[in-house]
Amino acid sequence: MMLPAAPENLLTAEGRPRFGRYAGQVDAFDWHELAPPHARGAWWRRFHHKRWHYVALATPELFCGVAIVDVGWTNTAFAYIFDRRERRIVAEFSQDGVPGLTASLAGNAGGASRFRFLSRRIGIECVGQRLYRLKVEGPGLRIAAEFGPDLMPLLLACGPAAGGSAHATQKSTGLPLWGEAAYGAVRHSLDGGVASFDYSNGLLARETAWRWASAHSLDLGFNLQAGYFGAQENALWLDGQLYGLGAAHFDFQPAAPLAPWHIHTDDGLLDLHFKPEGARAKDKNLLVAASRYVQPIGTFSGWVRASADAPKRIVAQLAGVTEDHRSRW
């Protein structure tokens, strides 16, 4: 099913969220005018408002993941470089910030998000004409990249969040990439690679869990999630068009995330096998907050199609990630 064009605003004039999946983008993610039954008090919103800005970069040699996260009462950020040939993370940092001081999250996917804590810095911004820039600096790690323009529509998904209120996300498929990633004395060109981004903004439950998969080339890509957001953000980009997908099923071994995964949707439009090359994992327990997270990096093979009667498109060794994540935030 091809998706309709995105509305101008996430909320109607009466404050009702425009739940659904759309092709395109909006200029603001603002929940202050939410009407009942989705509206909550300002104090509740302060502690349940979660936002993140994530960028993935993929080349035959490297996979890089970068994110800035604001959970309302604090913020954090991470960056890593994964060497696909050595099958290991060769540089990374993860840094908790100071509330209200170290992170600034964009109000939409076309805005600028920044994190700065001592020598660790991340900047994600749109520099005009649908072009984006990423800069990362940290101990032994540096990324300077530009990517875009978007060759296929952005996904806009808005829906209820289990245990919370409303949530929305804006995601790209593969974008042309150029730049450089460096660690220590080693430098890698990113030219000719593929970038993608995820801007998410919502009022979520204190206990939130999800499984996620994402991979992109310049002519094919997908995003899948099972958990707090249901099938709202499940989408396929193919031949310049954006299609909605059904509920996603993740068959894997949680105790052995580097074993093969099988992922498929219940509408018969996607069936993929994921072969991990390595993973980034964190397990934090700060008493008032906790996060258990594993993000395998690897390749997807199988098939996708735009409709039940369309021919299957073969997917072979498409670089991307899966994720098993549970947060108390």
Language-model-derived ranges and their functions:
Residues M1-W329:
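Structured soluble/peripheral alpha/beta segments that form catalytic or ligand/cofactor-binding pockets
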